[in-house]
């Protein structure tokens, strides 16, 4: 069993995380994070349309909605099933409430510190020290892309995580982000 001190590291202020990590996270999980107020209605519409036509869709949960689930166990998805409509609506309502009380930087900081990564690793401090042997502010672009790739499917096969990380890194390079060093 993993040492519980390693499992959840220290709280890391958002300013103490690398710009590459913040960019990789937003590209991976919520591209319109700074444009919505907790619920990305465009993503909800796209997911609903895809579900209607039985197409594979990307989830519509924003970072704020995911954070609401991390903060309130009643809003977390059951391990064996998908979220029901009522649970999804409750999560959206909680996300909107969070957005009225917290600033975007506070939401992003809390998310990075509470999100589960691979196995029992929770939070960016535990991940950066366990996986990379360094602090969160020292993560470079490839490491940041890998960290963000682990969020979507923390226990996916390594090949799938690596493929996703490579796609994220390419997106970061395509945007010519100045945090790639």
Task: Identify what each model region corresponds to.
Residues 1-181:
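Juxtamembrane regions of bacterial inner-membrane/periplasmic proteins
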